[in-house]
């Protein structure tokens, strides 16, 4: 929806990431250890699944919380809305800070395998701070909660969990995730001032209203 110069500059918006030895980094390390403990649990399985943003990964992640399957076939307008937001949230809202700090990811710093080893080669070339996955998940949750207000609690909780999954996977620090939510919130505010986004959002709301009236929403 947006061009790079239309999005809040994450480098100006965010503080620098915590440095090793600081109290903030000690919390990052504690959360990393917490995340490792979750990997052998059902929550760890969810975290690994949340790492997949390709194809229908994002829409599938939010379908249960949203109350109806989000897909090209069943909810084309809603699907288009959240799909078009992905680059805005995951790239544009995080790019400046990511490129400037190029923060080393947890699995690299601690010399341990992440929960998604197949993605490590690419992740190693991409800065850890802030988290793009988190930004996508939180921005998506904010917009879906606006469409289906009756399930805002479930949707926002799922969006929060989506970010925590990155800590569990060992590919982001907690501070990366927290920062991802900040830039995502700023992005959604800016999207609401964009005519193209507002037009698509209106289509998505109209589509949802019809589905709800037809009794197809939980």
Locate the predicted segments by residue:
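Catalytic phosphate/nucleotide-handling subdomain of diverse soluble enzymes
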Residues: 185-187
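Hydrophobic alpha-helical bundle signature of multipass membrane enzymes
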Residues: 1-169, 190-193, 200, 211
């Amino acid at each position: 929806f947006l061009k790079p110069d239309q999005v809040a500059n994450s480098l100006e918006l965010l503080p620098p990431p915590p440095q090793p030895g600081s109290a903030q980094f000690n919390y990052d390390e504690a959360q990393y250890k917490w995340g490792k403990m979750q990997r052998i649990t059902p929550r760890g399985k969810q975290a690994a699944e949340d790492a997949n943003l390709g194809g229908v990964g994002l829409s599938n992640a939010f379908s249960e919380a949203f109350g109806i399957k989000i897909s090209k076939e069943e909810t084309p307008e809603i699907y288009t809305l959240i799909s078009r937001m992905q680059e805005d949230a995951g790239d544009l809202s995080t790019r400046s800070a990511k490129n400037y700090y190029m923060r080393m990811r947890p699995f690299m710093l601690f010399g341990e395998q992440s929960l998604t080893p197949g993605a490590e080669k690419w992740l190693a070339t991409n800065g850890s701070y802030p988290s793009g996955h988190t930004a996508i998940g939180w921005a998506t949750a904010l917009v879906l909660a606006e469409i289906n207000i009756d399930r805002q609690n479930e949707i926002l909780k799922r969006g929060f969990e989506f970010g925590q999954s990155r800590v569990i996977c060992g590919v982001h620090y907690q501070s990366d995730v927290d920062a991802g939510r900040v830039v995502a919130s700023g992005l959604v505010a800016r999207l609401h001032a964009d005519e193209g986004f507002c037009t698509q959002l209106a289509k998505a709301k109209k589509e949802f209203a019809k589905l709800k009236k037809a009794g197809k929403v939980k």
